[in-house]
Amino acid sequence: MVRSLNNMSRKRIGALIVFERRTGLADVIDSGTVIDGEISAPLIENIFEPNTPLHDGAVIVRGERIVAAACILQLTDDHSLSRELGTRHRAAIGITESTDAVSIIVSEETGIISMARDGKLTRYLDTKSLNILLTELFMPDDLPPAWLSSRSSLFGARAVKQKEDGDEE
């Protein structure tokens, strides 16, 4: 995931990826095209390739799968946002205001990678901070071990084992 975000950032390919958490996103998924594919850099980069049918709109990720692409999101009503933030950023913030989803945005104009969570935007994420944020976000203490263990291939088995055992190895 992080590799594909960095590749798109470097090439200035805009992207919006929404990670479903506890709040279901069925209505949003229904607005797009069903994909149901395993997360991979080539798939993500192909979806967001400019001038292709799926590149507009958001990709929705559930667990370790891309469930839909070209999904329509409601924009935030926050009029205090900087004018330099476009529709992609406003949509990313909007979905996180009404759900517990987390959105990752790659700016088409600047290549800047940002994250929206709880209606707030964090900009200028580099590879290290993106890895840390995604790992922390998807390995919280209050989720059952079965959910965590399904993340091992996405974030690394060692990180999942440490979180489950509660100690550092």
What are these regions (language model features)?
Residues 1-169:
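Divalent-cation
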